UniProtKB/Swiss-Prot annotation:
Organism: Campylobacter jejuni subsp. jejuni serotype O:2 (strain ATCC 700819 / NCTC 11168)
Residues that, per the record, bind Zn(2+): 58, 93, 109
Catalytic activities: adenosine + phosphate = alpha-D-ribose 1-phosphate + adenine; S-methyl-5'-thioadenosine + phosphate = 5-(methylsulfanyl)-alpha-D-ribose 1-phosphate + adenine; inosine + phosphate = alpha-D-ribose 1-phosphate + hypoxanthine; adenosine + H2O + H(+) = inosine + NH4(+)
Entry protein name: Purine nucleoside phosphorylase Cj1217c
Protein family: Belongs to the purine nucleoside phosphorylase YfiH/LACC1 family.
């Protein structure tokens, strides 16, 4: 693991890629926009030239980043471009970062709906469609802070649906999104999985909608370096 401080957590940092989570302030104010500036230089990440924030819609929609994008309504972004930070806002939903050693990155907002609809598979399918000879052994999946099973109660129609379609990941009325995503990743041939192990509900350093009913969000980020 890279640097870990009171205002950010670095999961991978080398000469090719940076992956981190920033929780020093409410990043929800940057939603749904491409920012032509480095919003994370104060944390020591100096290489970033642009920061791309999705207009997250709780879907499994994934798009390929283009600097001319006008509509950022999606829950996943894919890019090969250097020094462009792909950003995921969350406060219990799972932020997923996918990195392929050939120089491809993706940032995914995998909440309950996105996980049920397997947004990770949608992302990998798009990547492999554009890059048919990729070695799947060189994919790396990072699961950043999100709600853990013991704090994720579901009920009503959602619980009934989960028990029917995802029974292995439901214990009484608790849903284990992290276990579901790991299972989906392994089915896609992704074996390099790093879970930061942080529950956003338990750790008060992180915003949690379930705990506090807040509209504030921390951000998970990935970018390729020159």
């Amino acid at each position: 693991m890279g640097r870990s401080r009171k205002n950010f957590l670095s999961l991978l940092e080398n000469d090719k890629v940076g992956i981190f989570c920033a929780f020093d302030k409410d990043y929800n104010v940057f939603r749904a926009k491409i920012h032509n500036e480095n919003l994370f230089s104060h944390l020591g990440f100096k290489d970033i030239e642009k920061c791309v924030f999705m207009d997250q819609i709780h879907s499994h929609k994934v798009i390929i980043y283009d600097e001319n994008l006008k509509n950022l309504s999606c829950d996943g972004l894919i890019s090969k471009e250097k020094n462009i930070a792909l950003c995921v806002l969350s406060a219990d939903c799972l932020p997923l970062i996918l990195y392929h050693e050939s120089g491809i990155i993706a940032a995914l907002h995998s909440g309950r709906k996105g996980s049920f609809e397997n947004i990770l598979k949608e992302c990998v399918d798009q990547i492999t469609m554009q890059n048919s000879h990729l070695d799947k052994n060189k994919f790396h999946l990072f699961i950043l802070p999100g709600i853990c099973a013991k704090n994720y109660e579901i009920d009503g129609e959602i619980l009934e649906f989960a028990k029917k379609e995802f029974k292995e990941f439901v214990q009484d009325d608790k849903l284990d999104l992290k276990a579901l995503v790991k299972f989906q990743a392994q089915n896609l041939g992704i074996e390099n999985i790093k879970d930061c192990g942080i529950c956003s509900f338990d750790d008060e350093s992180f915003f949690s909608y379930r705990r506090d009913k807040t509209t504030k969000r921390f951000v998970s980020v990935v970018y390729l370096k020159d």
